[in-house]
Amino acid sequence: MKGEALKIIEEVLAQGRTAMVEYEAKQVLKAYGLPVPEEKLAKTLDEALKYAEEIGYPVAMKLMSPQILHKSDAKVVMLNIKSPEELKKKWEEIHENARKYRPDAEIFGVLIAPMLKPGREVIIGVTEDPQFGHAIMFGLGGIFVEILKDVTFRIIPITEKDARKMITEIKAYPILAGARGEEPADIEAIVDMLLKVSKLVDDLKDYIKEMDLNPVFVYRKGEGAVVVDARIILKG
């Protein structure tokens, strides 16, 4: 767990970087048993075609570059690619968009990912307070975080009881619990993720400055959750 994650962190720091690309961040999460999609990093078009075939169409493509952390601004995320022909076209387009956005961008490759079925969007974040150390944050994604600031915080490490309270304390909890005849979300999967993030950060507190799992798709009770996008900033 820790050894595997540390190896990735040390490689990033050795390159003089503190911002991990999404692929690296997800590898760290995966080392701690967090649910990430079955994605593969393609360095060539041939690899991209091979991985898309293995994963099964439709797929998503995301260009990985340490200079392009806001991928949607740079138009380097392509969704719902349905065929090899379309993938070839999008491969050219995604690289062209990256060059326009940051001509000096170093490109690590393109992440080929399955198209995920949408779930309830939640966000899990970590920040470091100079006085109290690392804190973990939880809330519903989108408007709830951005506009309503409906989030809860706890100092790391957290207990299972803390994780459950973090979830029930948000104002939007009824949405997760299954208000108005909606199917309840998989609360146990969220509890598990909060505990695993807490353990990860507690183990690696000397290295991690902040972390953002946004969005996380949470499915119906018993169906789990998956980290759709992730960002980790390391201490320099």
Swiss-Prot record:
Temperature dependence: Optimum temperature is above 90 degrees Celsius (at pH 8.0).
Domain of life where this protein originates: Archaea
Activity response to pH changes: Optimum pH is 9.0 (at 80 degrees Celsius).
Record-linked PROSITE patterns: ATP_GRASP
Domain ATP-grasp intervals: 26-62
The keyword ATP-binding appears for this protein: yes
Keywords recorded for this protein, A-Z: ATP-binding, Ligase, Nucleotide-binding
Entries under InterPro entries matching the protein: Acyl-CoA_Synth/Transferase (IPR051538), ATP-grasp (IPR011761), ATP_grasp_subdomain_1 (IPR013815)
Catalysed conversion reaction: acetate + ATP + CoA = acetyl-CoA + ADP + phosphate
A GO term, aspect molecular function: metal ion binding
Binding-site residues for ATP, renumbered to this chain: 52-63
EC number: 6.2.1.13
Family: Belongs to the acetate CoA ligase beta subunit family.
Its biological purpose: Catalyzes the reversible formation of acetate and ATP from acetyl-CoA by using ADP and phosphate. Can use other substrates such as phenylacetyl-CoA, indoleacetyl-CoA and isobutyryl-CoA, but not succinyl-CoA. Seems to be involved primarily in the degradation of aryl-CoA esters to the corresponding acids. Participates in the conversion of acetyl-CoA to acetate and in the degradation of branched-chain amino acids via branched-chain-acyl-CoA esters.
Subunit-structure text: Heterotetramer of two alpha and two beta subunits.
Protein name: Acetate--CoA ligase [ADP-forming] II subunit beta
Source organism (scientific name): Pyrococcus furiosus (strain ATCC 43587 / DSM 3638 / JCM 8422 / Vc1)
Lineage: Archaea, Methanobacteriati, Methanobacteriota, Thermococci, Thermococcales
